[in-house]
A protein has these predicted regions:
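The catalytic Nudix box helix
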Residues: 1-28, 48
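Generic structural "secondary-structure junction" signal
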Residues: 3, 9, 31-33, 59, ...
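Acidic/polar loop patches that form or flank catalytic/metal-binding clefts of enzymes
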Residues: 26, 57-59
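Active-site-adjacent beta-strand/loop module that shapes the phosphate/pyrophosphate-binding cleft
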Residues: 33-57, 72, 88-96
Length: 124
């Protein structure tokens, strides 16, 4: 993430940089924290649901080896896809995820990020 960048902005930017696909952020589907992942450092992993605004893929070869569109059933049925990734896709299909919201009293908005499920705002 870039300094001052929110998660939703980073997700949209990273996908466009690495695949050439323009997207719109919809929700956060998954968050994973892995203690001591590499070099004794933690790894934080976010997965977002994004709506594609374009479909032409242009791979940034320094970052990724392969990128393609495929039917969800093929993805979930593939023996080469790790169970963690299948679990994330299943969660995205079965849950609306959590979306960015603003909460009164937390200003300026540039300093705060809140992600909540639909209908979670109280008293705004």
């Amino acid at each position: 993430m870039l300094p001052g960048e929110h998660l939703e902005e980073a997700a949209v930017r990273e996908v466009e940089e690495e695949t050439g696909v323009s997207t719109e952020f919809e929700s956060l589907v998954c968050f994973r924290h892995w203690h001591g992942y590499r070099y004794g450092k933690s790894d934080i992993y976010f997965v977002s649901r994004l709506k594609p605004l374009s479909n032409q893929i242009t791979i940034q070869e320094e970052e990724i080896a392969e990128c393609l569109w495929m039917p969800v059933a093929d993805f979930l049925g593939s023996n080469s896809i790790h169970v963690f990734n299948k679990t994330i896709v299943t969660a995205a299909l079965n849950s609306p995820g959590v979306s960015p919201i603003t909460i009164e009293g937390y200003e300026p908005a540039e300093r705060f990020e809140f992600f909540m499920p639909p209908g979670a705002i109280v008293g705004n």
